[in-house]
Structures are given as structure tokens and as C-alpha cells.
């Protein structure tokens, strides 16, 4: 693992913003990582809901062939989407490195299941074209509360993975049921 990060990187993971300027009697703090997540959420909500590119992303997720037939440059939009995913992964990695004060390459190795479950809980479809930034945000919050609760109840990581996998399977069963 790589260690010895600068104070700026540590600030992303451990930094706090003092809120006494709001006139609060007690000293209240807001984590920098929470502020950063809120800023990213607002930017991406605007991007996905108020821009043409955001609408194209939904169209490509729903049916890439129809999107291509309607004149959308699918390959260009996919490059943009994958670039944004890489950028957001980098932000997440910086926050994680700041929290742990180390850059371990396998640190997020088991996070894929949580990410998929958060998206599914938030209403995103396995089949594309559906889902919202707000829904995914809600799914992430629910997953965080679920993980925290399971950790507080001292549930082993194996059974946590089983539970989260079951949530995904149940959502697939629910999606595939005829209406």
C-alpha cells in the first residue's frame, strides 16, 4: 500500500467544515466528503435532467439502436459516460485514500455488489434506460444504513454479502414478473 498522502488528500477523508458561521450556539461540523458528494449529486442531477447529453444517455440506455437511428452519436456518448464513471471513481478513490491514509489497490474490490444493489434499490433497471440520480442517491443511502446496521449487529461479512445478493435476486424476480 502507498501511504504518506498530503494534507489535502487527508482533508477529503477527514476534513470538517465548521458551521458556527451559521449562528449555531454549539460548534457543529459537516464532513468535507459529504459536501463533495452533495456538490457532485447536484451537478449530475442537472446534467442528467436538464441537458441534451443527459437525455441521450437515457435514450442509449433504453435502446441503443433506436438512439443511433434517431441521430445520436452513440459511441461518442458512451465515451463520455465511461469517462465520467472513471472521473467519479477517482473522486471516490481520493476520499477513500484520505480516510484510510493509504492507497491500497484492492481497497474497493468488493464494492461492486454494493454499487449494483444501491442502483437496483434506487430504481435503476438492469435492462437500461430507467433510473434517476435521486433514486441512486437514495439507494446509496439505504445501502449505507443497511451496511452500518449489519456491522453494528456484528453480522459477518459473508452473511452481509448473502443478504445483499438476495436483495438483487429478489429485485430481478420482481422485475421479471408479468404485470
What are these regions (language model features)?
Residues 1-7, 11, 48-52, 109-110, ...:
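Short loop segments and helix-boundary regions at transmembrane helix junctions
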Residues 1-51, 77, 100-105:
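Transmembrane helix-bundle core of multi-pass membrane transporters
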Residues 43-82:
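Membrane-helix/interface signature in polytopic inner-membrane proteins
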Amino acid at each position: 500500500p502507498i501511504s504518506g498522502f498530503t494534507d489535502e488528500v487527508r482533508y477529503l477523508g477527514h476534513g470538517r467544515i465548521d458551521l458556527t458561521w451559521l449562528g449555531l450556539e454549539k460548534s457543529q461540523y459537516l464532513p468535507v466528503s459529504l459536501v463533495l458528494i452533495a456538490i457532485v449529486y447536484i451537478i449530475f442531477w442537472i446534467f442528467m435532467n436538464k441537458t441534451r447529453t443527459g437525455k441521450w444517455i437515457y435514450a442509449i440506455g433504453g435502446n441503443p439502436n433506436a438512439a443511433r437511428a434517431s441521430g445520436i452519436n452513440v459511441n461518442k456518448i458512451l465515451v463520455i459516460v465511461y469517462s465520467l464513471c472513471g472521473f467519479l471513481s477517482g473522486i471516490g478513490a481520493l476520499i477513500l485514500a484520505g480516510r484510510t491514509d493509504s492507497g491500497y489497490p484492492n481497497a474497493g474490490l468488493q464494492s461492486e455488489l454494493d454499487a449494483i444493489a444501491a442502483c437496483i434499490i434506487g430504481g435503476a433497471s438492469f435492462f437500461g434506460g430507467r433510473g434517476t440520480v435521486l433514486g441512486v442517491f437514495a439507494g446509496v443511502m439505504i445501502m449505507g444504513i443497511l451496511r452500518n446496521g449489519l456491522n453494528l449487529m456484528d453480522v459477518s461479512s459473508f452473511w452481509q454479502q448473502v443478504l445483499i445478493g438476495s436483495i438483487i435476486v429478489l429485485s430481478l424476480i420482481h422485475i421479471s414478473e408479468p404485470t
